[in-house]
């Protein structure tokens, strides 16, 4: 187990007056299956780019001891066999194999020393069994072995999506950032991918498909207008907690409004009484209208703050 630590991070794109993230801090466990939710434009894909190092924070830090990979993963040569495409997503196995053959053929002491180092890397990446592992994982996603011999570009978009997910999860010390995987999946493909991801751990998933999130994740990051929240549970758990918070704040705001009305009426009555006393020149106790008015004003500020949060919560839905 390790963690991803975001500390006091601020980020804005060049030329923008508004920060996407401002002084945010949170911690993620790399064993979590984390769903990343929030309205469009709130910075979900931007945050994945920050983790990948494709963007840099203006201030603050992101610390992690894992290697990040991003889905979708580009495959430049669609004419290569699907098996070879999957292998290349994991490690440069074919290049390593070619180089090891060259070193063995050379046979010098120096060449054999380099061969030993390269073979160790090959073994640590499961190079000797990688084809079997790819075949096994692809089968879990309903991709038959014969499809792995076809050109990658001839696979359906759904097959390419599922095979890419399978390959990336075979990488060692890898934390996967999955951006909208259901875009090219039909209902059966979503079921297969959801079932597959539910059996994995160690990823962040961005998806607008709430049912898919429910089947897959065990934690949720919520990107709100003012902050970022991390909660345990799937999307439905997060939604239930959010609705309860909204209902609590609504009830609290209604109570505040009743108190404001009571204080305002009290201040008005006291003012009328004080004015009558002053007009009749009769001395006596005076009522502090300023104090009551100040207290009512503070309550109104709290009410407005709650209403703003309620509006932001409604916009998130």
Predicted regions and their residues:
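ABC ATP-binding cassette signature C-motif
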Residues: 1-254
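Flexible nucleotide-interacting loop at or near the entrance of a catalytic core
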Residues: 2, 106-107, 113-129, 144, ...
